[in-house]
Amino acid sequence: MERPGARRLLSLGLPTVWGAVAITYKLACPLAQEENMGARIVSSAVFFAVGTGLILHVRRALLRELRQMREVAGAAQNVLLRPLPSRVEGLALAAGRLSASRGASVGGDLYEVVATDHGVRVVMGDVRGHGLAAIGTVAAVLGSFREAAHDEPELPLVLRRLERALGRHLRERARAEHPAGGGTPPETPLAEEFVTVLLLEIDGDGGISALNCGHPWPHLLSGTARPLTDGEPLPPLGSFPLPADLPVLGCGRLLPGEALVLHTDGMEDARDVAGTFFPLRAVLAEAARVPPVSPQGLIRAVCTRLLRHTGRLPADDAALLVLRNDRSRIPLQQPEPDRHAPTMSGG
């Protein structure tokens, strides 16, 4: 295995050798001193070869650095937005994402699925913006969720933990970006910084509970595709403080064979050259006609159709998360007028 010190020595030595060859030729070779056409052609060929060698060496060095940066970014992505297991508590899972930046592996979309004593808990969110600032916000929200999902018995308490974690992160960022405040945190976080967040809880009976802060509602696939509910979401986290009362929305039950599709607004907002939005619901309805839906197959189909629709990378990051109920049965409950009718429960 080549050592880093040897690589650095080689990277410095080769340009030095090429430069020494050019200077030696110019100063010591009699042919370089002549003024006739043949001598000039030979001199031009020598310096062209030297220049080409230098360019190729720099190109190889840049490609090597790019590979290393992508490896580091991929490792960071797997830690931050770690790959989901294929199955959690009888639910089949798959997730996919498309970045608005070519070659990028990190962005402002976030998702996680964890099995807890309170049921399977799911988060999907979208940070306003891109780049390193968005990645730091994703880390703050996801880190808080991974702890709060196990610790807190109710979804509203999980959401309040996310709000506090986001507030701390934004205040620390503001203090770091504006150190003139003498170490005193600003009174308000960064302006126009917010995160849309969707929290779901799926219990052992398939019952779905939700809290939504400005995020698109999931689609339920059961022979067709329709929004899980039409309830009014709360404002995104960071834009306004959460209200004192956080009512949990009951969204019916996820029956065996049915699937939920969570997504960020980059899916619905993607447009073609004519400005037509991507028909996400129609694509999902087409996939739902032949149950059971394959989570991985659905991810591939939607991403392929989206790229075909736009003809290029989407203008915004887009993420998709699919959960299919593979449980063999759901315990009997009291009859419900409509198994998917939204109901409100206090939280």
Identify the function of each model-found stretch.
Residues 1-74, 78, 82-85, 110-118, ...:
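Conserved subregion of the PPM/PP2C metallophosphatase catalytic domain
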Residues 78, 99-101:
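Membrane-proximal, non-transmembrane interaction regions of membrane/secretory-pathway proteins
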Residues 89-97:
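A short, Trp-centered hydrophobic/proline-enriched beta-strand micro-motif
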Residues 87, 103:
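Portal/gating segments that form or line small-molecule/metal binding sites
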Residues 104, 110-174, 276:
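Primarily the active-site beta-strand->alpha-helix module of PP2C/PPM metal-dependent phosphatases
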Residues 95, 122-125, 200:
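Preference for bulky hydrophobic residues occupying beta-strand positions
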